[in-house]
From Swiss-Prot:
<protein>
    <recommendedName>
        <fullName>23 kDa integral membrane protein</fullName>
    </recommendedName>
</protein>
<keyword id="KW-0472">Membrane</keyword>
<feature type="transmembrane region" description="Helical">
    <location>
        <begin position="13"/>
        <end position="36"/>
    </location>
</feature>
<feature type="transmembrane region" description="Helical">
    <location>
        <begin position="184"/>
        <end position="205"/>
    </location>
</feature>
<feature type="topological domain" description="Cytoplasmic">
    <location>
        <begin position="206"/>
        <end position="218"/>
    </location>
</feature>
<dbReference type="InterPro" id="IPR000301">
    <property type="entry name" value="Tetraspanin_animals"/>
</dbReference>
<feature type="glycosylation site" description="N-linked (GlcNAc...) asparagine">
    <location>
        <position position="165"/>
    </location>
</feature>
<feature type="transmembrane region" description="Helical">
    <location>
        <begin position="56"/>
        <end position="71"/>
    </location>
</feature>
<dbReference type="Pfam" id="PF00335">
    <property type="entry name" value="Tetraspanin"/>
</dbReference>
<comment type="similarity">
    <text>Belongs to the tetraspanin (TM4SF) family.</text>
</comment>
<feature type="transmembrane region" description="Helical">
    <location>
        <begin position="83"/>
        <end position="108"/>
    </location>
</feature>
<feature type="topological domain" description="Cytoplasmic">
    <location>
        <begin position="72"/>
        <end position="82"/>
    </location>
</feature>
<keyword id="KW-0325">Glycoprotein</keyword>
<keyword id="KW-0812">Transmembrane</keyword>
<feature type="topological domain" description="Extracellular">
    <location>
        <begin position="109"/>
        <end position="183"/>
    </location>
</feature>
<dbReference type="InterPro" id="IPR018499">
    <property type="entry name" value="Tetraspanin/Peripherin"/>
</dbReference>
<dbReference type="InterPro" id="IPR018503">
    <property type="entry name" value="Tetraspanin_CS"/>
</dbReference>
Amino acid sequence: MATLGTGMRCLKSCVFVLNIICLLCSLVLIGAGAYVEVKFSQYGDNLHKVWQAAPIAIIVVGVIILIVSFLGCCGAIKENVCMLYMYAFFLVVLLIAELAAAIVAVVYKDRIDSEIDALMTGALDKPTKEITEFMNLIQSSFHCCGAKGPDDYRGNVPASCKEENLTYTEGCVSVFGAFLKRNLVIVACVAFGVCFFQLLSIVIACCLGRQIKEYENV
């Protein structure tokens, strides 16, 4: 096989560098997924079950990107055409999945308030020890009261709705919903950022694979 030219060595270096970036992004995704998982679990099993799939999916995607990025690094270092094309194929599949997930996350954020409202209204209508602890934690953490306001308690406002004898006036649906939306947007932005680097990696990996194949036939 002939020696790769300067341009192809640059492509090889680009593939390697982009994969290192994707690898770091995958670690960020795994960390973000773990953080969201822990955060959601702090607010009780009722909330955790509703959004449990989201952080787990983020962690799984992060692990897959980690493995695929490693494959890309090996393909670039070894100048292996088969590994580079496999790497590009897996990246295309991941790219489509991530774009779909990011779009769904952005669209889904408009439904958060209605789902939180249904969850909290149902919790206040049929209070149990677990649900009461869940509401108390939300109220004390986010300085809110009830689903839509302190009137939800019909005059029997719990201590978690107060601070120095002042009752929180905002409902938890709007306050907690805004918290979830912010985190959802952050996750979507990270996903779009990862997709950008993956798209570059796909193009450069295919170019490198084609050029290596041409050099092998010289």
